[in-house]
Amino acid sequence: MLPQWMLILSVFGFLILVIWIGRLTSKWIESSSDFFVTGREISLLINACAIGGIGLSASVVAAMPMFSITLGFWPSFLFYGSMWAVAVIIYGLTIGGFIRRTGAYTISEWLGMRLSTKTRVICATCQLLGTISVMAANIAGISAVLVPITGYPYVLNVLAITGTFLLYTFLGGMWAVTIVDVAHIIIGMPAYYIVISLLLAKTNLLANLPGADWRLYSLTGHMPLFRLTFPSMITMGITWLVFVFGSQYYWIRLTSARSERAAIGGAVWGGVGAIIFIMGPLALLGLLALDLVPGQWAPAQAWGQLVGHSLSSVMGVWMIVAVLGASMSTASTALMGTSSTAMRDFYQRFFRPRATPQELVNPSRVAVLIAGVFTALLAIFYPGGAAWLLAVAAAWFGPPAVILVLTIYWPRITPTGSFTGIVTGLIATVAWQLGPYWQTTMHMIWVAICVTLVVTVIVSLLTQSERGRKSLTTELDEYHTQLMSLLRQGRTTLGAVVDGMKVDGERIYHYLQYLMDMGYVKKEGETSLSQVTFSLTSEGNDMLPALSTEEQLSAKFALTPADAAILKYIATTNNFDAASLSEASGVARSNINQNIIHLVTHGYLLESGLWRRTVKVSPQGREIVDKL
C-alpha cells in the first residue's frame, strides 16, 4: 500500500487546484450561455485537448489494460481505444459543423426543433438517464480501483470524488470543466510516458511476456471480428459510434466551440491525438502488469495491480492523481450534459420559456447539484458496478443516435415516425438487455439501431402528410419581427438566431416555420447545413420597417449600426474590453459576444486566444471601416 501521507497530500493538492479553477472561472459566468457553453468561446486547440483527454477516462483506463490481457495488445489498441477515437473523428467530420450551426444546447432541443416536443421529451429522458449512467460508471470505476490502493472505503471514495467535481462545476460551469480537462492531461500524460519507459526497460521490452505470440505479435489476438456480441471488432465500432453520436456529452463539447471550424477541428484533432499519444500507452499497461505482477489476479485489476506493486511510491501516487483527474474531468463533462438537458429541455422549455440567460444561471447551478446527488446514489447502490452502468448507457443512447442522423440526412423523417421509432427502440433495447441474449447472441446496441431505424423509416413513409404541416402560430408578433430583423442583418444561421433571440430553440423554429409558411423566410435546403441556414424573402423584407440612412449603409455589408460601431472601435483603439465596447456601441455587455461572432463570421475580425477569445480587425474589416 502506498504511503498514506504522500497520497493524502498529493490528492488534496489536486483537489485544491480544481476547486481554485472553479472559483477563478466563476467570475466568467454572467449567463446560462456562459455556464453551459462558455459563451461559445472554446478554441480549436482547447477543444481538441478536452475531447482527446476523454481517452484517459477511468473507464477506458481500466478497460484497455484488461483487453490487452484477454484479447491482445493490438485488439485493445486498434479495436477498442482507437475505434472510439475514429468515432469521434467521424462525428466531427459529418455533423460537427452542423451542431455548431444549429445553436442548440442539446440533442433533444434540436429534435424538438426538427420534429416534435414529445420526441424531444423522450430523447431528453434518454440523455438524462444515459449521462447519469456514464457519470456513475466513471465514479464507480475509479472509486473501486482506489479501495485496494488507498485502503479507503468505496462509499467514501464516491462521496469525496463526486463532491469535488460538483463544487468546481457548480462554480465555473463548462469553463471550469474545460480547464480541468486540459489540466488533467498536463498532469497525467507525463506520468504515463515515464511509467511506460521505466517498465519497458525493466522487462527488457516485454521479452518474457506470457503468450507473446498472440498478445503482442498477432493483429487480431483472441478478438472475434464479426460477431454481434461484445467484445468483437464490429460491435465495438458500432457501440462507440452510438455512444458518440447519441450522447449529449459530445454534443455540448462541439456546440461550445467558438466557430464551426473549431467544432470540426476539435473533434478531428482530439481523436487523432488520442490515437497517437494516449491509446498505445494504455494498452501497454496491461501487458506490463501481466509480465511484472506475480500471482493470480483478475485482468480487470491490471491498472491497480501495476500501480500498487510495480511502481515507486512517487510514481504510484502520480498515477493515482492522473487517473483521479481524468475520472473527475470525464464525469464533470457528463454532468454538464445532464444539467444542460434538465435545464434546456425541461425547466426552460416548460416552466420558464421567456426567462433571460441571466435569470437561468442559479437554476442551472441547482440542476448541477441535483444531477450530482443522483450520480452518487447510482454509483453507490447500482448492482453490477461500472461495466453494467456503461451497458445501461448504451441502451439509452442508441435510439437518439439513429434519430439524430436521420434528421440531418433524411428529409422524409416525420414527427410520428421519430416518436414511434425512438419509443419502440428504447423498449426493445431495455427488454433485450434484461434477458441473457445480449451476452450470447447479439449485443443490445444492434437491437437499438435496427429496431429504431426500421420503425422510424416505415412509420415516416406512412405519415408523409406531416411534412407539410403548418405552424401553430396564427399571427405575427414581436418575436417574428425580431427574427426577420436578425435575418435582414445577416444573421442567417439557426445558431445566430438562437443566440440573438435568447429563447428556447424549439420556439424559434416554430416562428421560422410560420414565416416560411407565409413566404417571408426561406430555408436553403432540406439536409445537413442547408436546413439550418435561412434567408429573408422580398415579401419578408417588405414586412419590416424601412431602414434609416445609417442602417442602409451598414446593411450593404451585412452589418447593423451596432456592428459597425464595434468594428470601428476595435479598429481605432485595439481594445476588446466588453464594457468599453458596450459603451461605444450601445449594446448590452452580455450581448457583445453575438456581435463579435457575427463580425468574425463575415471575415471583418480575426479571432485568436487560447482560452478567451481575442480579436483584431482583418484587412477586409479595415476596408469596411474606411467605407463606413
Please describe what each predicted stretch is.
Residues 482-490, 565-573:
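Short amphipathic alpha-helical elements of helix-turn-helix/winged-helix folds
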Residues 503-517, 586-601:
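Short amphipathic alpha-helical interaction segments
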Residues 1-478, 495-500:
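Membrane-embedded helix-loop-helix hairpins and adjacent transmembrane boundary segments
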Residues 490-501, 575-584:
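Short acidic, hydrophobic short linear motifs in intrinsically disordered regions
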